[in-house]
């Protein structure tokens, strides 16, 4: 429970770095793991968690290996909070994955994001 609260606080802190709570976030659109366009505007009026993730990052590995992140994702999505996992590593760079690899990682880790965006 302590780790869950700390993780949520960290996510809240990171999210508030450029957009204040209650303000409208700038819109963006990205393709998801199924090659469908997902726009932030689709979730207007809903609470959204943006998770920048990199499967090779030791901190990300730790949270997924302990199933800490999956538990938080499931709790949030079960409570109608949108969870967008964003993999922003460029092709040829550390952490890059294809859409198929993103699907495999999500399945292997038993992750529960609403979408994985690439």
Language-model segments: residues:
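Short, solvent-exposed loop/turn and secondary-structure capping segments
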Residues: 61-64, 95-98
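Short, internal strand/loop/helix patches
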Residues: 100-118
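Short active-site neighborhood of thiol/selenol oxidoreductases, capturing the structured segment around
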Residues: 41-61
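Sec-dependent N-terminal signal peptides
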Residues: 3-14
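Thiol-based oxidoreductase modules, predominantly thioredoxin-like and allied folds used
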Residues: 80-96, 113-118
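Boundary at the C-terminal end of the N-terminal hydrophobic targeting segment
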Residues: 16-21
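A short beta-strand-turn-helix
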Residues: 28-48
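Conserved helix-turn-beta segment immediately C-terminal to the redox Cys motif
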Residues: 46-47, 62-86
